[in-house]
Amino acid sequence: LNGITICDEFFYSLIGENKYYGTPINLNAHGCVPGGSSSGSAAALTTDLYDFSIGSDTGGSVRIPASFCGLIGMRPTHNRINTKGVYPMAPSFDTVGWFANSVVIFQKVGEVLLDKMDKSDINFRQFVIAEDLLELCDAAVQENFNNYIKNNLPGIDKNRLSNISKDIIADNFRILQ
């Protein structure tokens, strides 16, 4: 089954407009843009004619249209879903994500796309934690996070960094833009 939708020009914007083919209509927010760049994939679901759609995500291209269109959307970790056949924009960031209106459908699509993964497949040796950002979370969230790391990442160096300023995060995000 193949489907084609419209994305913004060169899949490079986060608002989803396409001046050449028309901006996909966001029926969940009349008069508002659908978000981009996978705008057509998200807007198609606002018609209630489809159960789910797929989009590519490099720097927000599934998550942003999901938010703008009132959908459930996800960008899984890089290389978690095969990108064969996906036109690359930034191969070291590109991944495939999906949208749905229903949590049940969203989960079913996820079960198909994200086949079961054994924890032994995890092959990284280092995990970096931004302490000052973690401190912004509620105490219960911090405790759950630390317990998860302790119980699920044994034998992995856990470097704890502090003073990760918002400016550093913003500067690194600019690279994606």
Model regions and ranges:
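A short core secondary-structure module
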Residues: 78-130, 135-137
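Short glycine/serine-rich loop/turn segments
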Residues: 1-93
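Amidase signature
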Residues: 115-177
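Hydrophobic transmembrane alpha-helix bundles
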Residues: 38-50, 91-101, 154-169
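Short charge-dense sequence patches
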Residues: 23, 53-63, 92-103, 135-137, ...
